[in-house]
Amino acid sequence: MGKEKFHINIVVIGHVDSGKSTTTGHLIYKLGGIDKRVIERFEKEAAEMNKRSFKYAWVLDKLKAERERGITIDIALWKFETTKYYCTVIDAPGHRDFIKNMITGTSQADCAVLIIDSTTGGFEAGISKDGQTREHALLAFTLGVKQMICCCNKMDATTPKYSKARYDEIVKEVSSYLKKVGYNPDKIPFVPISGFEGDNMIERSTNLDWYKGPTLLEALDQINDAKRPSDKPLRLPLQDVYKIGGIGTVPVGRVETGVLKPGMVVTFGPTGLTTEVKSVEMHHEALQEALPGDNVGFNVKNVAVKDLKRGFVASNSKDDPAKGAASFTSQVIIMNHPGQIGNGYAPVLDCHTSHIAVKFAEILTKIDRRSGKEIEKEPKFLKNGDAGMVKMIPTKPMVVETFSEYPPLGRFAVRDMRQTVAVGVIKNVDKKDPTGAKVTKAAQKKK
């Protein structure tokens, strides 16, 4: 074995009929971890149901169906390998929880693959005012997915087939749209493909010999691997806290930024409780250091389980320790709220692992979501499709950070009526120092 390949996450976005499932299914099918026997079973079933055309999408549909029925599917099925990377496909956006997942940081994508239906009528439907293509691209950009690959799909079904004129027209239109969202289209490869026939997916297609750019596989290899934020101060949002006999209190969570090591003195925001980390474990093995992306449990000295809760954030007490937010200002995009949102609105915020009601204390401005420029000062309300700057006050102590400093703790979903009604990124935080915070003896010795 040479050097381990880097892992990257890609999110596949696009209009509902653009061919996301077929294209993703094709990659997983050709490059991925699906057992050949499973595929043969799927193919046989598809043939029996006269769904031959649906071969690759069928693979994905079966996986989704099995997952939704609660049959745990080995997540390797959603992975495939390129020459340079192990790629994991993050939930395709048809999935209800996609937006919430994308925001609460269960999955930060390194790159978005935008699939476009190049057929007559298909493209127009996807990019129209209410098409999902726009919303997905905007969401990806707002949530910090800075790299994108565009696939002009269904090139085998354009008129005439594999039409360069159609491709050029789409590139021009999509580029101007992506530019408004905030992407630089010059940095985005536009790959003409057929997810079904396989043109330009992995091998270069003779049907598209007018195109000189990369195939989809080559474009994936050109993604810049994410700089993992291990040089930032520690932020580890707690998912759970356990009491383990003979060991004591063990908080569990994923390192988002920084490094966690045994012997470190940590401060838990928002309460300011400070103690020493005795040991750090991942998959029942002791670690000398835990890095961003690691899901770990760590043992803390002289701390009762009741003093820590899900949503608290562990940080290094000597390096910008986490504190509660008195208030914070966010840029919010209203996505599916049936009415109007005015001052005093109090929904629930899902930010990292915390789930807390906040008050929209003051809608400061309404902004143009394309340019980010202010359109109106102190508007009375925001409605569907609007973007604005809002001052928010948490109803209980909570830790949030600015998106620019700590991205996973600076983006959130606004939940109301059992759905995501808005998404946002935090621009600044007014932090408050904890009063009467407990510092354990172990931590005092280390001072």
UniProtKB/Swiss-Prot annotation:
Disulfide bond annotation, renumbered to this chain: none
Keyword presence, Cytoplasm: yes
Boundaries of every tr-type G domain copy: 5-230
Residue numbers of N6,N6,N6-trimethyllysine PTMs: 79, 187, 306, 396
Cited InterPro entries: EFTu-like_2 (IPR004161), G_TR_CS (IPR031157), GTP-eEF1A_C (IPR054696), P-loop_NTPase (IPR027417), T_Tr_GTP-bd_dom (IPR000795), TRAFAC_GTPase_members (IPR050100), Transl_B-barrel_sf (IPR009000), Transl_elong_EF1A/Init_IF2_C (IPR009001)
Gene3D superfamilies reported in the protein's UniProt record: P-loop containing nucleotide triphosphate hydrolases, Translation factors
PROSITE patterns in UniProt: G_TR_1, G_TR_2
Record-linked CDD domains: EF1_alpha (cd01883), EF1_alpha_II (cd03693), EF1_alpha_III (cd03705)
Annotated spans, G4: 153-156
Biological-process GO terms, alphabetical: translation; translational elongation
GO molecular function, one term: translation elongation factor activity
GO CC aspect terms: cytoplasm
Region ranges (G2): 70-74
Keywords: Cytoplasm, Elongation factor, GTP-binding, Methylation, Nucleotide-binding, Phosphoprotein, Protein biosynthesis
Binding-site residues, GTP: 14-21, 91-95, 153-156
Record-listed 5-glutamyl glycerylphosphorylethanolamine modification sites: 289, 362
Sites of N6,N6-dimethyllysine modification: 55
Top-level taxonomic group: Eukaryota
Described purpose of this protein according to its UniProt entry: This protein promotes the GTP-dependent binding of aminoacyl-tRNA to the A-site of ribosomes during protein biosynthesis.
Recorded family membership: Belongs to the TRAFAC class translation factor GTPase superfamily. Classic translation factor GTPase family. EF-Tu/EF-1A subfamily.
NCBIfam families noted in UniProt: EF-1_alpha (TIGR00483), PRK12317.1 (NF008969)
Record-given protein name: Elongation factor 1-alpha
